[in-house]
Amino acid sequence: MLPAVGSVDEEEDPAEEDCPELVPIETTQSEEEEKSGLGAKIPVTIITGYLGAGKTTLLNYILTEQHSKRVAVILNESGEGSALEKSLAVSQGGELYEEWLELRNGCLCCSVKDNGLRAIENLMQKKGKFDDILLETTGLADPGAVASMFWVDAELGSDIYLDGIITIVDSKYGLKHLTEEKPDGLINEATRQVALADIILINKTDLVPEEDVKKLRTTIRSINGLGQILETQRSRVDLSNVLDLHAFDSLSGISLQKKLQHVPGTQPHLDQSIVTITFEVPGNAKEEHLNMFIQNLLWEKNVRNKDNHCMEVIRLKGLVSIKDKSQQVIVQGVHELYDLEETPVSWKDDTERTNRLVLIGRNLDKDILKQLFIATVTETEKQWTTHFKEDQVCT
Protein backbone atom coordinates (compact mmCIF):
# COMPACT_ATOMS: atom_id res chain seq x y z
CA MET A 1 0.00 0.00 0.00
CA LEU A 2 1.23 3.50 -0.78
CA PRO A 3 1.94 5.56 2.36
CA ALA A 4 -0.69 8.11 3.30
CA VAL A 5 -0.04 11.62 2.02
CA GLY A 6 -0.50 14.64 4.27
CA SER A 7 -1.02 15.05 7.98
CA VAL A 8 -2.37 12.47 10.40
CA ASP A 9 -5.71 14.29 10.35
CA GLU A 10 -6.28 13.12 6.77
CA GLU A 11 -6.22 9.44 7.68
CA GLU A 12 -9.25 7.34 8.53
CA ASP A 13 -10.35 7.28 12.16
CA PRO A 14 -8.89 3.97 13.47
CA ALA A 15 -12.07 3.37 15.42
CA GLU A 16 -14.00 3.30 12.15
CA GLU A 17 -11.83 0.47 10.80
CA ASP A 18 -12.67 -2.02 13.55
CA CYS A 19 -13.07 -5.46 12.07
CA PRO A 20 -16.69 -6.50 11.41
CA GLU A 21 -17.93 -9.61 13.20
CA LEU A 22 -17.09 -12.54 10.95
CA VAL A 23 -18.37 -16.07 10.51
CA PRO A 24 -16.83 -18.78 8.28
CA ILE A 25 -18.31 -18.90 4.82
CA GLU A 26 -20.23 -22.02 3.90
CA THR A 27 -18.98 -23.79 0.81
CA THR A 28 -22.35 -25.21 -0.17
CA GLN A 29 -25.28 -23.29 -1.58
CA SER A 30 -28.92 -23.89 -0.97
CA GLU A 31 -31.07 -24.84 -3.95
CA GLU A 32 -32.72 -21.40 -3.88
CA GLU A 33 -29.35 -19.61 -3.88
CA GLU A 34 -28.14 -21.67 -6.82
CA LYS A 35 -31.29 -20.91 -8.81
CA SER A 36 -31.15 -17.19 -8.00
CA GLY A 37 -27.60 -16.97 -9.31
CA LEU A 38 -28.20 -18.75 -12.61
CA GLY A 39 -28.25 -16.56 -15.69
CA ALA A 40 -28.18 -13.28 -13.77
CA LYS A 41 -25.36 -10.81 -14.38
CA ILE A 42 -23.84 -9.23 -11.29
CA PRO A 43 -23.33 -5.44 -11.14
CA VAL A 44 -19.89 -4.12 -10.13
CA THR A 45 -19.68 -0.70 -8.49
CA ILE A 46 -16.28 0.98 -8.19
CA ILE A 47 -15.62 2.89 -4.96
CA THR A 48 -12.86 5.46 -5.35
CA GLY A 49 -11.57 8.54 -3.58
CA TYR A 50 -8.42 10.17 -2.32
CA LEU A 51 -6.49 8.76 0.63
CA GLY A 52 -8.48 9.18 3.85
CA ALA A 53 -11.71 10.32 2.17
CA GLY A 54 -13.78 7.56 3.76
CA LYS A 55 -13.80 4.61 1.35
CA THR A 56 -13.05 2.00 4.01
CA THR A 57 -15.55 3.63 6.37
CA LEU A 58 -18.27 3.34 3.71
CA LEU A 59 -17.46 -0.30 3.06
CA ASN A 60 -17.34 -1.13 6.77
CA TYR A 61 -20.76 0.49 7.11
CA ILE A 62 -22.12 -1.68 4.30
CA LEU A 63 -20.52 -4.79 5.80
CA THR A 64 -21.96 -4.29 9.29
CA GLU A 65 -25.37 -2.62 8.89
CA GLN A 66 -28.58 -4.59 8.51
CA HIS A 67 -29.87 -3.59 5.09
CA SER A 68 -31.15 -6.85 3.52
CA LYS A 69 -28.63 -6.47 0.67
CA ARG A 70 -26.25 -9.30 -0.21
CA VAL A 71 -23.16 -7.34 -1.18
CA ALA A 72 -19.69 -8.71 -1.91
CA VAL A 73 -16.97 -6.20 -1.03
CA ILE A 74 -13.39 -6.30 -2.29
CA LEU A 75 -11.07 -4.18 -0.18
CA ASN A 76 -8.13 -3.07 -2.27
CA GLU A 77 -6.62 -0.75 0.31
CA SER A 78 -7.59 -1.39 3.91
CA GLY A 79 -4.80 0.32 5.80
CA GLU A 80 -1.48 -1.24 6.74
CA GLY A 81 -1.83 -3.49 9.74
CA SER A 82 -5.50 -2.68 10.35
CA ALA A 83 -7.66 -5.15 12.28
CA LEU A 84 -9.85 -5.54 9.20
CA GLU A 85 -6.99 -6.57 6.94
CA LYS A 86 -5.53 -8.96 9.51
CA SER A 87 -8.84 -10.78 9.68
CA LEU A 88 -9.31 -10.95 5.93
CA ALA A 89 -5.84 -11.58 4.57
CA VAL A 90 -3.71 -14.57 5.47
CA SER A 91 0.03 -14.60 4.81
CA GLN A 92 1.60 -17.96 4.10
CA GLY A 93 5.15 -18.40 2.84
CA GLY A 94 5.40 -14.65 2.30
CA GLU A 95 2.51 -14.61 -0.21
CA LEU A 96 -0.82 -12.93 0.35
CA TYR A 97 -3.86 -14.84 -0.77
CA GLU A 98 -7.55 -14.16 -0.58
CA GLU A 99 -9.91 -15.46 2.03
CA TRP A 100 -13.60 -14.82 1.47
CA LEU A 101 -15.52 -14.43 4.70
CA GLU A 102 -19.26 -14.17 5.18
CA LEU A 103 -20.55 -11.50 7.56
CA ARG A 104 -23.58 -11.87 9.77
CA ASN A 105 -25.61 -9.44 7.68
CA GLY A 106 -25.21 -11.68 4.61
CA CYS A 107 -22.39 -9.74 2.95
CA LEU A 108 -19.13 -11.24 1.73
CA CYS A 109 -15.74 -9.63 2.21
CA CYS A 110 -12.24 -10.11 0.83
CA SER A 111 -8.95 -8.23 1.03
CA VAL A 112 -6.69 -8.27 -2.01
CA LYS A 113 -3.59 -6.22 -2.75
CA ASP A 114 -2.82 -7.04 -6.35
CA ASN A 115 -5.54 -7.72 -8.88
CA GLY A 116 -9.21 -7.09 -8.18
CA LEU A 117 -10.13 -9.04 -11.31
CA ARG A 118 -8.64 -12.22 -9.85
CA ALA A 119 -10.63 -11.71 -6.66
CA ILE A 120 -13.83 -11.32 -8.69
CA GLU A 121 -13.08 -14.46 -10.69
CA ASN A 122 -12.78 -16.40 -7.44
CA LEU A 123 -15.86 -14.69 -6.10
CA MET A 124 -17.96 -15.78 -9.07
CA GLN A 125 -17.53 -19.38 -7.91
CA LYS A 126 -19.86 -18.37 -5.08
CA LYS A 127 -22.42 -16.89 -7.45
CA GLY A 128 -25.88 -17.01 -5.92
CA LYS A 129 -24.72 -15.87 -2.49
CA PHE A 130 -24.62 -12.16 -3.41
CA ASP A 131 -26.39 -9.65 -5.64
CA ASP A 132 -23.85 -6.82 -5.95
CA ILE A 133 -20.06 -6.36 -5.95
CA LEU A 134 -18.31 -3.29 -4.56
CA LEU A 135 -14.66 -2.85 -5.55
CA GLU A 136 -12.49 -0.39 -3.64
CA THR A 137 -9.57 1.20 -5.48
CA THR A 138 -6.36 2.56 -4.01
CA GLY A 139 -6.42 6.25 -3.13
CA LEU A 140 -4.28 7.26 -6.10
CA ALA A 141 -5.89 4.95 -8.65
CA ASP A 142 -7.45 6.14 -11.90
CA PRO A 143 -11.00 4.70 -11.73
CA GLY A 144 -11.28 5.01 -15.49
CA ALA A 145 -8.64 2.36 -16.03
CA VAL A 146 -10.39 0.05 -13.56
CA ALA A 147 -13.80 0.73 -15.12
CA SER A 148 -12.45 -0.02 -18.58
CA MET A 149 -11.49 -3.56 -17.53
CA PHE A 150 -15.05 -4.40 -16.50
CA TRP A 151 -16.60 -2.62 -19.45
CA VAL A 152 -14.51 -4.73 -21.84
CA ASP A 153 -15.31 -7.85 -19.82
CA ALA A 154 -19.04 -7.21 -20.23
CA GLU A 155 -18.63 -7.04 -24.01
CA LEU A 156 -17.02 -10.50 -23.88
CA GLY A 157 -20.10 -12.02 -22.27
CA SER A 158 -18.89 -11.95 -18.69
CA ASP A 159 -21.13 -12.74 -15.72
CA ILE A 160 -20.54 -9.20 -14.42
CA TYR A 161 -21.26 -5.70 -15.70
CA LEU A 162 -20.10 -2.23 -14.68
CA ASP A 163 -22.87 -0.49 -12.74
CA GLY A 164 -21.27 2.83 -11.80
CA ILE A 165 -18.42 4.79 -10.22
CA ILE A 166 -18.75 6.28 -6.72
CA THR A 167 -16.19 8.90 -5.67
CA ILE A 168 -15.84 9.97 -2.04
CA VAL A 169 -14.43 13.43 -1.29
CA ASP A 170 -13.18 14.58 2.13
CA SER A 171 -14.95 17.81 3.19
CA LYS A 172 -11.89 19.05 5.08
CA TYR A 173 -9.17 18.34 2.52
CA GLY A 174 -11.13 17.90 -0.71
CA LEU A 175 -10.62 21.45 -2.00
CA LYS A 176 -6.88 21.18 -1.37
CA HIS A 177 -6.69 17.87 -3.24
CA LEU A 178 -8.80 19.08 -6.18
CA THR A 179 -6.82 22.29 -6.70
CA GLU A 180 -3.38 20.72 -6.38
CA GLU A 181 -1.27 21.39 -9.46
CA LYS A 182 1.00 18.59 -10.60
CA PRO A 183 4.46 19.65 -11.79
CA ASP A 184 4.20 17.57 -14.96
CA GLY A 185 1.02 19.34 -16.06
CA LEU A 186 -1.10 16.20 -15.73
CA ILE A 187 -4.56 16.11 -14.17
CA ASN A 188 -4.26 15.36 -10.45
CA GLU A 189 -5.73 12.11 -9.14
CA ALA A 190 -8.51 13.63 -7.02
CA THR A 191 -9.82 15.71 -9.92
CA ARG A 192 -9.80 12.75 -12.30
CA GLN A 193 -11.72 10.66 -9.74
CA VAL A 194 -14.42 13.34 -9.49
CA ALA A 195 -14.59 13.79 -13.27
CA LEU A 196 -15.30 10.09 -13.83
CA ALA A 197 -17.89 9.70 -11.06
CA ASP A 198 -21.57 8.94 -11.47
CA ILE A 199 -22.14 9.67 -7.76
CA ILE A 200 -19.96 12.00 -5.66
CA LEU A 201 -20.20 11.69 -1.87
CA ILE A 202 -18.99 14.76 0.04
CA ASN A 203 -18.04 13.05 3.30
CA LYS A 204 -17.36 14.31 6.85
CA THR A 205 -19.58 17.37 6.39
CA ASP A 206 -19.98 17.58 10.17
CA LEU A 207 -16.28 18.44 10.56
CA VAL A 208 -16.25 21.70 8.57
CA PRO A 209 -18.36 24.90 8.36
CA GLU A 210 -21.30 24.87 5.95
CA GLU A 211 -19.62 27.56 3.86
CA ASP A 212 -16.64 25.26 3.22
CA VAL A 213 -18.98 22.50 2.07
CA LYS A 214 -20.65 24.93 -0.36
CA LYS A 215 -17.27 25.93 -1.82
CA LEU A 216 -16.31 22.29 -2.24
CA ARG A 217 -19.65 21.47 -3.83
CA THR A 218 -19.23 24.34 -6.31
CA THR A 219 -15.75 23.14 -7.24
CA ILE A 220 -16.98 19.57 -7.72
CA ARG A 221 -19.83 20.76 -9.91
CA SER A 222 -17.40 22.83 -12.00
CA ILE A 223 -15.51 19.61 -12.74
CA ASN A 224 -18.42 17.21 -13.21
CA GLY A 225 -21.71 18.69 -14.32
CA LEU A 226 -23.40 15.32 -14.79
CA GLY A 227 -22.78 13.31 -11.61
CA GLN A 228 -25.11 13.38 -8.62
CA ILE A 229 -23.64 15.01 -5.48
CA LEU A 230 -24.64 13.76 -2.02
CA GLU A 231 -23.47 14.98 1.39
CA THR A 232 -22.65 12.39 4.07
CA GLN A 233 -21.27 12.00 7.57
CA ARG A 234 -19.11 8.99 8.43
CA SER A 235 -19.84 7.71 4.89
CA ARG A 236 -23.39 6.70 5.79
CA VAL A 237 -25.59 6.66 2.74
CA ASP A 238 -28.77 4.94 1.60
CA LEU A 239 -27.59 1.98 -0.50
CA SER A 240 -30.21 2.77 -3.12
CA ASN A 241 -28.08 5.82 -3.96
CA VAL A 242 -24.97 3.79 -4.73
CA LEU A 243 -26.32 0.48 -6.09
CA ASP A 244 -28.31 -0.38 -9.23
CA LEU A 245 -27.25 2.82 -11.00
CA HIS A 246 -27.10 1.26 -14.50
CA ALA A 247 -24.77 4.13 -15.41
CA PHE A 248 -23.06 2.19 -18.20
CA ASP A 249 -25.89 0.31 -19.89
CA SER A 250 -28.93 1.04 -22.02
CA LEU A 251 -31.31 1.14 -19.06
CA SER A 252 -29.85 4.50 -18.06
CA GLY A 253 -31.27 5.90 -21.29
CA ILE A 254 -34.75 5.83 -19.76
CA SER A 255 -33.88 8.64 -17.33
CA LEU A 256 -30.90 10.12 -19.16
CA GLN A 257 -32.87 12.29 -21.58
CA LYS A 258 -34.48 14.28 -18.77
CA LYS A 259 -31.17 14.55 -16.90
CA LEU A 260 -29.27 15.78 -19.96
CA GLN A 261 -31.69 18.67 -20.37
CA HIS A 262 -30.53 20.08 -17.02
CA VAL A 263 -26.77 19.55 -17.25
CA PRO A 264 -25.08 22.95 -16.89
CA GLY A 265 -21.98 23.92 -18.79
CA THR A 266 -19.18 24.71 -16.34
CA GLN A 267 -16.15 26.96 -16.10
CA PRO A 268 -12.74 25.56 -15.12
CA HIS A 269 -11.79 25.88 -11.46
CA LEU A 270 -8.16 26.16 -12.57
CA ASP A 271 -6.62 27.26 -15.86
CA GLN A 272 -6.75 24.40 -18.38
CA SER A 273 -8.53 22.22 -15.85
CA ILE A 274 -11.44 19.85 -16.24
CA VAL A 275 -14.86 21.19 -17.26
CA THR A 276 -18.22 19.84 -18.38
CA ILE A 277 -19.62 20.99 -21.72
CA THR A 278 -22.91 20.05 -23.31
CA PHE A 279 -24.47 20.74 -26.69
CA GLU A 280 -27.48 19.69 -28.73
CA VAL A 281 -27.80 19.21 -32.49
CA PRO A 282 -31.19 18.41 -34.06
CA GLY A 283 -31.66 15.77 -36.73
CA ASN A 284 -30.34 12.29 -37.39
CA ALA A 285 -26.75 11.12 -37.18
CA LYS A 286 -25.18 8.57 -39.48
CA GLU A 287 -23.61 5.91 -37.29
CA GLU A 288 -20.35 5.72 -39.23
CA HIS A 289 -19.96 9.51 -39.08
CA LEU A 290 -20.68 9.53 -35.35
CA ASN A 291 -17.99 6.90 -34.88
CA MET A 292 -15.58 9.12 -36.83
CA PHE A 293 -16.32 12.08 -34.54
CA ILE A 294 -15.82 10.07 -31.35
CA GLN A 295 -12.72 8.27 -32.60
CA ASN A 296 -11.00 11.52 -33.54
CA LEU A 297 -11.65 12.78 -30.01
CA LEU A 298 -10.84 9.65 -28.02
CA TRP A 299 -8.43 7.70 -30.24
CA GLU A 300 -6.68 10.06 -32.62
CA LYS A 301 -6.73 12.96 -30.13
CA ASN A 302 -6.30 15.45 -32.96
CA VAL A 303 -8.95 17.99 -31.98
CA ARG A 304 -7.65 21.27 -30.57
CA ASN A 305 -9.25 24.35 -29.04
CA LYS A 306 -8.78 27.99 -30.08
CA ASP A 307 -5.55 28.19 -28.09
CA ASN A 308 -4.21 25.16 -29.98
CA HIS A 309 -4.39 22.99 -26.86
CA CYS A 310 -5.37 19.36 -27.27
CA MET A 311 -8.89 18.55 -26.10
CA GLU A 312 -8.73 15.64 -23.66
CA VAL A 313 -12.05 13.84 -23.07
CA ILE A 314 -12.25 11.80 -19.87
CA ARG A 315 -15.96 10.96 -19.85
CA LEU A 316 -18.56 11.14 -22.61
CA LYS A 317 -22.28 10.53 -22.34
CA GLY A 318 -25.27 11.32 -24.47
CA LEU A 319 -28.38 10.31 -26.36
CA VAL A 320 -28.32 10.37 -30.14
CA SER A 321 -30.71 9.74 -33.00
CA ILE A 322 -29.22 7.27 -35.47
CA LYS A 323 -30.64 7.32 -38.98
CA ASP A 324 -33.02 4.42 -39.72
CA LYS A 325 -33.24 3.41 -36.04
CA SER A 326 -36.47 3.90 -34.12
CA GLN A 327 -34.85 3.59 -30.68
CA GLN A 328 -32.87 6.29 -28.92
CA VAL A 329 -29.19 5.36 -28.75
CA ILE A 330 -27.01 6.01 -25.72
CA VAL A 331 -23.36 6.83 -26.28
CA GLN A 332 -20.86 6.25 -23.47
CA GLY A 333 -17.14 6.90 -23.33
CA VAL A 334 -14.40 6.52 -20.71
CA HIS A 335 -10.88 7.43 -21.75
CA GLU A 336 -10.34 5.65 -25.10
CA LEU A 337 -13.25 3.21 -24.78
CA TYR A 338 -16.73 4.03 -26.05
CA ASP A 339 -19.94 2.24 -26.92
CA LEU A 340 -23.22 2.87 -28.74
CA GLU A 341 -26.26 0.95 -27.52
CA GLU A 342 -29.96 1.16 -28.29
CA THR A 343 -32.15 2.04 -25.32
CA PRO A 344 -35.68 0.75 -24.63
CA VAL A 345 -36.99 4.26 -25.44
CA SER A 346 -38.42 4.92 -28.91
CA TRP A 347 -38.49 8.27 -30.67
CA LYS A 348 -42.04 9.61 -30.79
CA ASP A 349 -43.44 10.43 -34.22
CA ASP A 350 -44.57 13.90 -33.14
CA THR A 351 -41.26 14.98 -31.59
CA GLU A 352 -38.12 16.29 -33.28
CA ARG A 353 -35.18 13.94 -33.22
CA THR A 354 -32.08 15.39 -31.64
CA ASN A 355 -28.58 14.55 -30.44
CA ARG A 356 -27.43 15.76 -27.03
CA LEU A 357 -23.91 15.11 -25.75
CA VAL A 358 -22.15 15.81 -22.46
CA LEU A 359 -18.35 15.74 -22.40
CA ILE A 360 -16.13 16.02 -19.33
CA GLY A 361 -12.48 16.79 -19.92
CA ARG A 362 -9.69 19.33 -20.23
CA ASN A 363 -9.30 22.19 -22.74
CA LEU A 364 -12.79 21.52 -24.13
CA ASP A 365 -14.33 24.16 -26.41
CA LYS A 366 -18.09 23.83 -26.76
CA ASP A 367 -18.39 25.85 -29.99
CA ILE A 368 -15.65 23.95 -31.81
CA LEU A 369 -16.97 20.56 -30.67
CA LYS A 370 -20.50 21.41 -31.75
CA GLN A 371 -19.29 22.63 -35.15
CA LEU A 372 -17.22 19.48 -35.61
CA PHE A 373 -20.16 17.30 -34.64
CA ILE A 374 -22.39 19.01 -37.21
CA ALA A 375 -19.70 18.82 -39.90
CA THR A 376 -18.83 15.20 -39.22
CA VAL A 377 -22.31 13.84 -38.80
CA THR A 378 -24.22 15.82 -41.42
CA GLU A 379 -21.62 16.76 -44.04
CA THR A 380 -18.86 15.09 -46.03
CA GLU A 381 -15.52 13.83 -44.78
CA LYS A 382 -13.80 16.50 -46.92
CA GLN A 383 -15.58 19.25 -45.01
CA TRP A 384 -14.61 17.61 -41.73
CA THR A 385 -10.91 17.77 -42.61
CA THR A 386 -11.03 21.57 -42.61
CA HIS A 387 -11.37 21.41 -38.82
CA PHE A 388 -8.24 19.40 -38.08
CA LYS A 389 -4.96 18.33 -39.63
CA GLU A 390 -3.12 15.05 -39.30
CA ASP A 391 0.09 16.84 -38.33
CA GLN A 392 -1.70 18.39 -35.36
CA VAL A 393 -2.12 15.12 -33.51
CA CYS A 394 -1.76 15.70 -29.77
CA THR A 395 0.95 13.85 -27.93
UniProtKB/Swiss-Prot annotation:
Residues passing through the membrane, by range: none
Entries under Pfam families matching the protein: cobW, CobW_C
Gene Ontology cellular component list: cytoplasm; nucleus
Record's compositionally biased regions (Acidic residues): 8-20
Keyword terms: Chaperone, GTP-binding, Hydrolase, Metal-binding, Nucleotide-binding, Nucleus, Zinc
Chain location of the short sequence motif psi-PxLVp motif per the record: 17-24
Superkingdom of source: Eukaryota
Sample GO molecular function, one term: hydrolase activity
Chain positions of motif CXCC motif: 107-110
Residues given in the record as GTP binding sites: 49-56, 110-114, 203-206
CDD domains (UniProt xref): CobW-like (cd03112)
Catalytic activity, reaction form: GTP + H2O = GDP + phosphate + H(+)
PANTHER family listed in its UniProt record: COBW-RELATED, ZINC-REGULATED GTPASE METALLOPROTEIN ACTIVATOR 1A-RELATED
Family of the protein in this entry: Belongs to the SIMIBI class G3E GTPase family. ZNG1 subfamily.
Name by which UniProt lists this protein: Zinc-regulated GTPase metalloprotein activator 1C
Taxonomic path: Eukaryota, Metazoa, Chordata, Craniata, Vertebrata
Gene (UniProt): ZNG1C
